[in-house]
Structures are given as C-alpha cells and as structure tokens.
C-alpha cells in the first residue's frame, strides 16, 4: 500500500511544485516593464546598461531576481514536507514509525532546498546571457527589450533558440512586400489583390539548421507562409513559444527534482527502519522500469544487471556506472522497490 501512497504523493507534489514555481515566475514577469528595459538599452556604454537592467529587474548579487528568490519560500516548504512524508511512508513499509523531525532527515531537507538553489542559479545564468544578447543584439531598443522579457525564465539554450527564431522572422519581415492589384482572368473571374514577399524562405530556414529544433523550424515556416505576416503577429508567436518553453522547463525540473528526492527519501526511510531492526536481513532494493514502450533501452538493462537486487547500502550497476538511485537521466521514470532477494 505504501508504494501506491508514495506514487500518489509524487504525482500531487510534482504538480504543486510546478504550479508554485510558475506562479513565482508570473509574479516576477508582472513587475518587468518593457518600456523601462528599452530606455535602458537605448543608453550608452555596456557596463552602464547592465547596471540599469540589474536595477530594473531587481537582480541580487547572484544575478537572481529578488522577487523570484522570495517566491521560492512556498516551493521550499513544500519540498521539505515532501521528503519527510516519503521517508515516513517508506519506513512504514517495514512497520517502523519514523520521527520526521529527527536529524536523519536534515540532510534530505537541505538537498531539497539545494535543488531550488541550482534551479535559481541556472535561471540567473540564463538571465545574464539574455541581457548580453539584448545589449549587443540587432534591432530597435524596443524590440530587444521585448525579446529580453520573453527570455526571462528560459535556459541559456532555450533563450538562444528563441533569438534564432526572432532573427529569422525579422529577416522575413524586413523583406519588402509587393501588392498585386485586383485583376480579372481570361474567364472573367475577378481575382482579389494579393500580397507577396520576395523573401527566400528556404534560405532563411536553412540558416537555422542545427540552432533550433525541427518543431521550431516548422513553427516559423508556417508563419512565413503568410505574406501578410505583421510584426505584431511575429511578436505574438514568439511570446507564446517563450511561454511554452518556460512552462516545459518548469514542469521538467519539477518532475525530475521530485523524482530524485522521492527515491532518496525512500532509501532513507528503509535504511532507518533497517537500523532499528524493522527489516528482515534479506531485504534488498530492486530496480523497476515503467514497463512500457517508452522505456529507454539503457534503462531496461538495469534490472538484468542487478538480478538479485542490491543491499540497501549498495548502488545499482547501470550502463551509466554505479548509481544509488533513479533517475538515471532526464525523463527517467524508473524507481526502486523493496523486497527479498530473488
């Protein structure tokens, strides 16, 4: 029963964590004024511009927005309670009652807070990269300011791909548009006026290869198929794609973080129960995959590499080397279960 309870706890907390982090980002983005960013970018001197942008974005000494740092209080408390609950449920599998306020869980709570710290550090690095792109990029200060705001909350790689998309669309928009007047064909049918652009869309798309994904290339290809595309249309597309990437990043980080903490919490609870003699001597950890067609081959190999399971204090053999816990890599859905040696 505890396995089902832990799985339910993971699912609910993963969603809650993502929602809370996303809410913190929305609160931060609501404070960012594009006109103020544009005014700063229209100034002289890169160092002066950086200093002005840091004030506008309210960045602390680490380059993290203060509003965002303050907004991590709720996610931090959520993770601290989560790791304690998982450890308690795992310990209960051995019919041992765990003191969730004990010192044994202190390091796990620290790990939970450290996870958010790494997330904020990655965010700060990406904001720094976005600022540099805004300072040295092409386009009007207003356009660069809008792109800077879009990039907030993305990873460095996501921000770079958004810059490539923006440049491609701008190249297309900068190409003159030609109006073909209304006319009547030889059959007497009136053909309404049409717009065409002389842009070489194939060349524009080719210039993005290796810099953005196939899905992103298809997105801008569909946009450039419209000769009536306007700057407002392009901005709407970029705004929406930036939101989607930010959402994906937050969900992925939340899923991965919760998974990692859950597996660590289970092991902690089992080892505490073992220390108090609540587990039989033959109890071992067994690697379990999700058991569907999405399981990667390298992940499916792990059970066979550990046929009898492993002792609680020993790592699993995996294609990536020895690992104490899942996840093996991004998107891993494997987990450890408790049982006797096979």
Say what each PLM segment does.
Residues 1-244, 249, 257, 339-342:
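N-terminal leader/targeting and assembly helices and adjacent pre-domain segments
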Residues 229-230, 234-342:
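Acidic, glycine-rich two-metal-ion catalytic cores of nucleic acid-processing enzymes
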